[in-house]
Amino acid sequence: MYKRQDLALAKDAGFTDIVVDVRPTTGDVLFKTNLVDQVKFMYAWIGSNYTKVERTATWDYLQAFVDEARKQGLRIHAAINTFVGGNQIDGGTGLLYRDQSKAEWATQMNMQVGITSVMNTSESTKFFNPAHPEVQTFLCDLLKDLAGYDLDGIFLDRGRFLNLQADFSEESRKQFEEYMGGIRIQNYPNDILAPGASSLPATYPKYLTKWLEFRAKVIYDFMQKARTAVKGVKPGIKFGVYVGGWYSTYYDVGVNWAASTYDTSRYYNWATSKYKNYGYAACMDQILIGAYASPLKVHGTTEWTMEGFCSLAKDKIKGECPIVAGGPDVGNWDTNNQATQEQENQAIVQSVKACMNVCDGYFLFDMIHLKKADQWQYAKEGIKLAIE
């Protein structure tokens, strides 16, 4: 019943597409596959309480949304959290907690105390090592199962490294040394990044910029494989990603979502001349840009304004991806409570036109926030103004 109501509200507001998250950060799934467990519980807002809800139903969650979307004339896409395998929630949930044989899949962090498995850190989301060949094979196989559904598109979220401290495993070291022509790094990891460093130092260690280049290549190569996996099952499905618009610091997660013709090194000193070679925009049929600015920063030309995030992304992608849509996170955009409720409502209205005017479309993250605050009317008003 709820899916019918939710999609009807989205359709009435003027949305043309919905994206259904079918692999949360635990790494378990809400679609049919034999590769990993089904989601057994979720936390949801019930009234004013964030409550654990056990999943006892056995019906196909994704198929139910596909069926309802088709009835209502909406396009439907599935999204997965990609390089994740567990979450600390409920004492630890997900593949990395259940299956000790996959311990090497967990990303290795460059901590002050030494290189440490993410499983032994306070990071709540337990990431895989994106460079691990078995991880990549597992995820491509998972995507093949997902592509079997009647979907218009698939989006990869968290298709990245956890942060700048990842991944410093022996596997990544071996691959990097091979990438560098077979060198042996004598002072590892210090010649790349000092233990415990979580941001770029004033003086770059010997191999840091080549390491950033290598990480971008790891993600670029994976995206090519993932696209091939999806298109091999269903060539007509649109393949895409969901990324943050803050390109100026997105090196920290190893992602270059720009066009390969955008020469990053002309603008940022952390980028090598080869960094641009691993811009993966041309691999994508559609890209969602998280334009996650404050509700008080709708308009502008710089990062950390919604309009600026979208216009800068469109410029960097240079037409290599045909659909670039940006939009706000309306549930987490004012953590310091600087905006009034009316300012937030009007930011939703204004954000649609601000984003759509400078890129190819608009998305809103996410439906639960509109439902909780009963803000559908503001999305509807904004869409109407944007398409007039």
Locations of regions flagged by a protein language model:
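Short, acidic/polar
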Residues: 3-11, 133-145, 258-282, 306, ...
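Catalytic domains of carbohydrate-active enzymes, especially glycoside hydrolases
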Residues: 4-28, 149-153, 276-289, 355-362
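Aromatic-lined carbohydrate-binding/catalytic grooves of carbohydrate-active enzymes
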Residues: 15-57
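Aromatic- and acidic-residue-enriched segments that line the glycan-binding/catalytic groove
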Residues: 30-43, 84-119, 159-198, 252-263
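Active-site-adjacent "subsite" loops/lids of carbohydrate-active enzymes
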Residues: 77-149, 197-208
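Substrate-binding cleft/loops of secretory-pathway carbohydrate-active enzymes
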Residues: 85-88, 164, 233, 238-297, ...
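Active-site neighborhood of glycoside hydrolase catalytic domains
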Residues: 148-149, 153-157, 162-163, 167, ...
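Substrate-binding cleft of secreted/luminal carbohydrate-active enzymes
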Residues: 272-388
